[in-house]
């Protein structure tokens, strides 16, 4: 356990940031998964779900949760999947 006051504060901040980042990543993964499931099932709303998933990936990349190249790769793969 930290003893120094600033270390205690940083530990609290790290816990909050971890929760926030985990929630954001989970939201992104869920959006991508919903798009994949809709496309597999042949649902009509696949294009709308693609836009939501793409926005979620962009948001995660802008916040530094995933790297820009991964975001670009994921979006490219989803776009190719949508075009099929």
Swiss-Prot record:
Binds directly to 16S ribosomal RNA. This is Small ribosomal subunit protein bS20. GO terms for molecular function: small ribosomal subunit rRNA binding; structural constituent of ribosome. The keyword ATP-binding does not apply. Belongs to the bacterial ribosomal protein bS20 family. It comes from Levilactobacillus brevis (strain ATCC 367 / BCRC 12310 / CIP 105137 / JCM 1170 / LMG 11437 / NCIMB 947 / NCTC 947). InterPro entries: Ribosomal_bS20, Ribosomal_bS20_sf. GO terms for cellular component: cytosol; small ribosomal subunit. One of its GO terms (biological process) is translation. Keywords: Ribonucleoprotein, Ribosomal protein, RNA-binding, rRNA-binding. HAMAP family: Ribosomal_bS20 (MF_00500).
